């Protein structure tokens, strides 16, 4: 069966799949802002509504470290977050990248069928993940819940995930300023970072009652402690709670990523239609934006989820233990973590000391993150319409050629630059993620990068639509 025939199998689903109709004309900037704001508000509301019928949600959480990246809130309608949608995209990226599924980019029908296939896969994954979450006892033993409550929980999870999928489609089809998935994820990350920095709640520690938020704790410690030097040290380096060092590292990483956004390779181009008209085509360092780290997180989350579920069911099976052994790390009261196996080696490094104490894990983890981000970035360009062939076609349609090169050599020249730039940019974003984890930030390195690149991308889109300056950080673009 040919790959085109495989795509044709999804054509019958077109008539009854939920779909957002693309706008007939360009949506005005002000309306895009409204649609983006309303979509974000709906998403935030879904993340605050608890699931009806839960007996308990105090079981181990295999996705604890990745919930921010997946825009997931435990025990709410957004339990699944954007994981099924990203996973579906990752699966079809793999199928296309390995030539198991081929589409003709110039064919509108192929592109539409490809999107339908992705949507069908996402719905199947939504159902599958909802079944797994409910039937593995995350909200109480299924026998205690009963069949009606189990079905109700599955329905709630599916309904909310379908709403998220349609909101993403709404924004991506031109009603909003960009990708809904990126926006939802960045908002969830920013919300968690803000809470860790400014949370007014208090917790009981060995040092007495302390404010959870790092900034509030900083001022509180300076106000109540007589020994100001000791208060400063405690505020900057306290353990098991957010501290000011993490706040400063988060701000530093944010600004550094903004700085790197200005790095690009400028390809000189000229017009074949207007004599003397020249310009540049910029190829950015982050050519595929935050897509590599998003897909890498989706891959990791699925491995973690499957590993922990299998370990709970078959804890003594040697093959299952090879995939991952889960438990609470000795000397901590935190969530369950991978203690050995494959899951342990791809689990994020929590600190520089952990990296030094286990160099084998450090090498494996860094290789995995950099390699997977580079591969995802390089293959993503074939799907997203930014491959050398796609850009060469744009040049031809617009009557542009590379300065000093013949028109027939455009594709060959772009093929030398774009795949390398995409892979290098993906590896760079992976390296920044690992570095952020080692330095210590309010959240994982991947989540900080995801939020920063999304915020910058949305700012650029708003600047383009609204016609104002793109210089987000004064002076940064001048250094390029």
Swiss-Prot record:
Subcellular localization, as worded in the UniProt entry: Endoplasmic reticulum membrane
Keyword vocabulary terms for this entry: Endoplasmic reticulum, Membrane, Protein transport, Translocation, Transmembrane, Transmembrane helix, Transport
General remark: Present with 24800 molecules/cell in log phase SD medium.
Stretches assigned to the Cytoplasmic side: 1-32, 96-119, 168-212, 261-290, 382-416, 460-480
Name under which the protein is recorded: Protein transport protein SEC61
Protein encoded by which gene: SEC61
Impact upon substituting residue 406 to E: Severe growth defect; lowers SRP-dependent and SRP-independent translocation
Family, as annotated: Belongs to the SecY/SEC61-alpha family.
